[in-house]
């Protein structure tokens, strides 16, 4: 049953760190946790509606949130910071206002961008790339092969596994297909595993995409 556990939660405190860093009173904890989720969803929705179809779209790997007494700091790790700050920073201002509208807080909001050079070595970005290809009706085997090639070319990737489940290529019966290259040691705690589950909305229904990327051991 070891393979059933979430690869990131399994390694929290070992090779993974929390994406939300703050302290709160017990009575406020659930409200702030919900606020963090709203911030992340707002950023993803903004990117999906404004930037996702761009030819040089690089994706979002993770969103880190830190809270201080009078400040909420949001750090977006992305492969396309230039797209968010285009128009002399207007894109970032629009995003900031959109986030403020989605939450009710008296704290100041600060959004920073961290560029990822090898973004296809990030599970979230690679899973979103696969979803875009499947939604464009590209054959799933061709998509998996191309995604593995893109990831392995990044240099720091030691192994990768991709799994797609659903009505593949419009088949009547849903099934699961997967491909792997290199080592993906899910049982090794010191192994740096990046993982993402992402849904692809196709004309034949929803396809579930899972990506595991092994980046070495600590």
From Swiss-Prot:
The subcellular location is: Plastid, Chloroplast
Q: Does the keyword rRNA-binding apply?
A: yes
Question: Per the record, GO CC terms?
Answer: chloroplast; cytosolic small ribosomal subunit
Q: Name one Pfam family in it.
A: Ribosomal_S3_C
**Would I find RNA-binding among this entry's keywords?**
yes
Q: What is this protein called?
A: Small ribosomal subunit protein uS3c
Name the protein family. Answer: Belongs to the universal ribosomal protein uS3 family.
Q: How does it assemble?
A: Part of the 30S ribosomal subunit.
Q: Name one GO molecular function term.
A: rRNA binding
| The KH type-2 domain, residue ranges | 47-117
Keywords from the UniProt entry: Chloroplast, Plastid, Ribonucleoprotein, Ribosomal protein, RNA-binding, rRNA-binding
Q: Which GO terms describe its biological process?
A: translation
Bilayer-crossing regions: none
Disulfide-bond pairs as recorded? none
Where is it mainly found?
A: plastid
